Design a protein with these regions (language model features):
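Conserved "right-hand" nucleotidyltransferase catalytic core of DNA-directed polymerases
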Residues: 1-143, 165, 209, 229-433, ...
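Structured ligand/cofactor/substrate-binding pocket environments in proteins
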Residues: 9-12, 448-480
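Short, basic/hydrophobic alpha-helical segments
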Residues: 147-162
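Acidic, metal-coordinating catalytic cores used for nucleic-acid/nucleotide bond scission
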Residues: 162-174
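Metal-dependent phosphoesterase core characteristic of DEDDh/y 3'-5' exonuclease domains
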Residues: 171-224, 286
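Short, polar/flexible loop-turn hinges at active-site or ligand-entry regions and domain interfaces
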Residues: 181-183, 199-200, 216-221, 240-246, ...
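Generic long, charged, amphipathic alpha-helical segments
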Residues: 480-502
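Short, amphipathic alpha-helical "recognition" segments used to contact nucleic acids or chromatin
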Residues: 505-515
Length: 530
């Protein structure tokens, strides 16, 4: 019956799925024959497009004679010198410039309890430093048997008159500060500069930046052996491996200097150098200190909130089981699907290869079918609150500081916004009462308060300026609520009758358009049709 009712669709599908053999082709079959291809030209295109995997897949590494000659030249561009720390310190003080690369390794993970209870924010230790001297075109490498040996560099690292250039300085700041060194004089971070040049580039490590800006494959350049692990001996010092490290990290610090020169040149070309120098680079230190200071968590308040949630979850579990007429695992999609669609005979909205779908979209559509759906949605919300914000936050509380030291990033989002991870402090819920309780566990020090400063609708002001939209400009000039005004027009409601929800929806529309949201994305966010 379904086939008969949809026979037009069936014939259309057949037409679409049939390969047309009657297409007029003017060229000869011989013209399509694959012959020898210009590997040097392909390599050039792949490098331009950063198709590094294809370079490997088609064995194009070092294919051209020019590339090989360039690599030989590049290998002779700097000299690795063995000097004493004292000699190098004098050179740095004289030049008032320090281009460096820190090598760090994860703390001993054999004792997981000690690792979890570590007071360090970043559970890594500094094992070496490489330094580049541009005047003499030399690199120096020092490895440390103990992390505290880097204290020999403390004076120059803390001297703000000595300008520093490196990569991922937010991490460097924390690594140094947690052992008692407060780095100052931060001038250049190549990962930040590269991000400004291309905010969609998420490969900002030294190896990828070297390929992008210098067209050098670091592994090929350094001569990293694939079987390097065979050289490892866990019970005795390995000289060959140490020499490999020396070679590798000396090259890295040299690359940092070369990449930095190219980045600064490009930033000036696009008039973004002042932005980099006066806004983004000072932000590195601000974000680093924010991560270092962390946010205090009231553990007792968190524990009490967790207890409340557990009690509410237990009550909801009991109610759901009673409404279903039997006990089952509410967290099991399979068991929940069987209860709702087989036992309770609710309409099937969507099926997956594993059975019935019970995702939030499906449950939202079934809310009017049975009161159990509302209970299940509430249950899931409470479970997420408990796992993400109660149990989740607990694991990030530093045992010494009693604070959460979230990582703040300025080189991740394509829009230029700051983001945070481990944990994400920017998605703490606010829209419902229980969500607001989560925020109450974050408290300032005694006698201090949190200050929330924000540009007022900055994106829309920029949009008004660029678009020269008279209505928007007038609204801002008259200090009118732009979102409320939009809601009034969209919902055809008098300005003084616009509800909080309508304003919120209009705000989503306004910002969604600015950031290029799709009709599907906006519909999903607002729960409306496309």
């Amino acid at each position: 019956e379904k086939i008969e009712n949809n026979k037009d669709l069936a014939f259309l599908s057949k037409t679409l799925g049939t390969i047309n053999l009657e297409v007029p082709i003017e060229d000869n079959l011989e013209d399509f024959k694959v012959e020898e291809w210009d590997k040097e030209k392909v390599l050039e295109i792949f490098k331009e497009l950063n198709f590094n995997r294809y370079i490997e897949r088609f064995n194009l590494k070092g294919n051209s004679q020019n590339t090989k000659e360039q690599d030989v030249e590049k290998k002779e561009e700097f000299k690795q010198k063995d000097k004493s720390i004292e000699e190098v310190l004098e050179i740095i003080k004289k030049q008032k410039k320090l281009t460096f690369f820190l090598k760090s390794e994860k703390e001993d993970g054999n004792n997981l309890t000690n690792l979890a209870n570590s007071e360090k924010i970043i559970k890594e230790k500094i094992t070496a430093i490489s330094i580049y001297n541009k005047e003499n075109n030399e690199t120096y490498y020092f490895d440390f048997n103990e992390e505290k040996e880097i204290f020999k560099f403390k004076e120059i690292l803390e001297n703000k008159e000595i300008l520093k250039t490196s990569i991922n300085l937010t991490k460097v700041y924390i690594l140094l500060r947690q052992i008692g060194i407060l780095i100052d004089g931060i001038e250049n971070d190549i990962s930040v500069g590269a991000y400004i040049l291309n905010p969609t580039n998420n490969k900002l490590d030294i190896k990828n930046l070297t390929m992008q800006y210098l067209e050098i494959d670091t592994e090929e350049y350094i001569g990293t052996e694939e079987n390097e692990q065979e050289q490892l001996n866990l019970f005795e010092e390995n000289t060959e491996l140490k020499n490999n490290d020396k070679k590798e990290y000396s090259a890295y610090v040299y690359f940092i200097e070369m990449i930095n020169e190219k980045i600064l040149e490009k930033l000036k070309e696009i008039n973004a150098y002042e932005l980099y120098k006066n806004i983004d680079m000072p932000t590195v230190e601000v974000l680093s200190s924010m991560q270092w200071n962390g946010m205090y968590i009231d553990e007792e308040e968190l524990k009490e909130f967790g207890k409340e949630l557990t009690e509410k979850i237990e009550i909801l579990t009991k109610e759901i089981h009673e409404m279903a007429g039997e006990e089952f695992n509410i967290n099991s999609t399979k068991q929940l699907g069987e209860i709702l669609f087989e036992k309770m005979k609710l309409p099937i909205v969507k099926k997956t290869k594993n059975g019935y779908s019970t995702d939030v979209d499906v449950l939202e559509k079934l809310k009017s079918e049975d009161p159990i759906i509302e209970k299940i949605l509430d249950y899931r919300q409470l479970m997420k609150l408990n796992s993400t914000y109660v149990e989740g936050l607990k694991q990030y509380i530093n045992p010494k500081t009693k604070r959460i030291h979230s990582f703040f990033h300025q080189t991740i989002t394509a829009t230029g916004r700051i983001s945070s991870t481990e944990p994400n402090l920017q998605n703490i819920p606010t829209r419902f009462e229980l969500g607001k309780r989560v925020r109450k566990v974050f408290k300032p020090e005694e006698g201090k308060v949190y200050i929330d400063a924000d540009y007022s609708q900055i994106e829309l002001r920029v949009l008004a300026h660029i678009s020269e939209d008279e209505h928007m400009i007038n609204a801002f000039n008259n200090n009118e609520d732009i979102h409320k005004q939009a809601a009034s027009k969209v919902f055809k409601t008098p300005l003084d009758e616009v509800t909080k929800e309508q304003r919120s929806n209009a705000k989503a529309v306004n910002f969604g358009i600015v950031y290029g949201i799709s009709d599907f994305g906006l519909g999903e966010q607002l729960g409306i049709s496309r």
